Amino acid sequence: MSHFPKLLSSQIAFDVARTMLDGFDKHYRLFREVSVRAKALFEAGDWQGLQQLQRDRIAYYDERVREASVILEDEYDAENIDDEIWRQIKLHFIGLLTNHHQPECAETFFNSVCTRILHRSYFNNDFIFLRPAISTEYIENEESPTKPTYRAYYPGSREGLGGCLERIVHNFQLDAPFEDLPRDIGYVVRAVGEHFGDFRIAPNFQIHVLSSLFFRNTAAYIIGRVINGDKTYPLAVPIMRGADGQLRLDTVLLRPEQLLILFSFTHSYFMVDMEIPSAYVTFLRDLMPRKPRAEIYTSLGLQKQGKNLFYRDFLHHLQHSSDKFIIAPGIKGLVMLVFTLPSYPYVFKVIKDYFPPPKETTRELIKSKYQLVKQHDRVGRMADTLEYSDVAFPLSRFDDALIKELEKHAPSMVEYQRGADGSDEIVIRHVYIERRMTPLNIWLHEGTDAQVEHGIIEYGNAIKELIAANIFPGDMLYKNFGVTRHGRVVFYDYDEIEYLTDCNVRDVPQPRNEEEEMSGEVWYSVGPHDIFPQTYGTFLLGDPRVREAFLRHHADFFDPAMWQAHKARLLSGQTHDFYAYDASERFVNRYGDSAPGNAATPLRRAAA
């Protein structure tokens, strides 16, 4: 039952609400400035600057939340404001959002500040935004008509598809020359023709393109959609910058599954300038209807909004399901206790209180490793994690075996309380949540020969891409990797992760005598950061099918020279290009230097 006041009589309530909104507005202004800065760094080819910008931006939100919390404590003694005033604060905040362009994100910021000040017994819709209050539908950027959320183009007109695409590219006003834009436009037109074949143009044939570029790694992406009749198709064009400073269109992505991979939870967040983020999410959801809005917000760099939406979706699922949380199937970890809800496609990971040998780590060190992954370029090979504190679950939904495991291995992380409805709850004090995947060891054990080969190709590629991004996984057992819905192999166990540049890549020394040669134990000295690629075959090549596929596709994996070459390149300051699509899709591999052909549209107009 709601206890909202009938009258808004408190000046303090309004001032507190205004202070919180000012804090959010400052955050979002800085957030947008990062995206504008990303364009200049891309044009200059300053990849280290882009990486640093990405890392810095992740910290902005928490910095502004702390800043706002301190102001409220210092100026309004927020911890001692009574309940009636807090209810008025929320209502004033709602009123201030009436014409706001990012109301959903502002509500989340409000929650973040309040949960730093209020006890968790206040975490209900009377005091925070457990549910959204302001609709984000049809918010328009009326103050800046020159830059709408997206622009519409009509390739069925006289200029044709080629001219239309060229205008799309020029409208982004990139301050760097193209190597050969007519050639690249020709490639795009050719690829469109090959993909759609005999494509008849309907009267409503048009292309919508989001007004801002999407920056990530060393690429800038044009994101749009093609509308023809009652069909909508994705359109994504990555722009790359060569060593000579010239730009090129690298490929065109036209399949829904390609867009899903581009916006996957295994990639770093995009930097994109959005006046109205909800409009971008709506646009992208039209192209990826099965992708949760939470994941789209997160991929756009609004990870706190994504986290908030995920939790709302999770609570909704709990209300409409009855299965129990259970210990996750598979090999139990030494560091994490992992559980899952079978009807929900995620796993929950709790750091244990004690770590048996040979693990030598601490809770804080493990958390720092997960933060490292959050801030690093995940290059499509490391799963993103959602981190929560003090999460209350219905105790009746926990399997008895799971409760015993939690009390045995992580007692400091478990509390019990009475819920608002009088039911018993179990509170997990700290938990990571990740997408559930098929463990690679199970995939390899149960798969067909073709699946085993695919899994090993992907595993080798994943490791090579990770070390190219300066990530050494540490524990490379197959159980620490998962296979996504799209068949990509992804790393998800981060407690032993290191920078490759901090590792000493070594050859196994030659034995000095027969005793050393026959020894079943390591007889040579091993430093804390030493790695020996020649020894990896011992625990990776036991299965004959795996061994055959591994040596056929990744024989260099066990050669220290391959690892050392990556380390040397990183130490020299070189940045690797990572592609969120198969290399065979790149125009340089698909068409080479072949003539692009006529850039006129190959599409035929449908009969009226």
Swiss-Prot record:
Instruction: Provide the E.C. number(s) assigned to this enzyme.
Output: 2.7.11.5, 3.1.3.-
**Superkingdom of the organism of origin:** Bacteria
Its Gene Ontology molecular function terms?
[isocitrate dehydrogenase (NADP+)] kinase activity; AMP binding; ATP binding; phosphoprotein phosphatase activity; protein serine/threonine kinase activity
InterPro entries linked: AceK_kinase, AceK_regulatory, Isocitrate_DH_AceK
Predominantly, its location class is cytoplasm
Q: Which residues form the active site?
A: D384
Recite the UniProt keywords alphabetically: ATP-binding, Cytoplasm, Glyoxylate bypass, Hydrolase, Kinase, Nucleotide-binding, Protein phosphatase, Serine/threonine-protein kinase, Transferase, Tricarboxylic acid cycle
What's the protein here called? Isocitrate dehydrogenase kinase/phosphatase
Taxonomic lineage from the root: Bacteria, Pseudomonadati, Pseudomonadota, Betaproteobacteria, Burkholderiales
Q: Which gene encodes it?
A: aceK
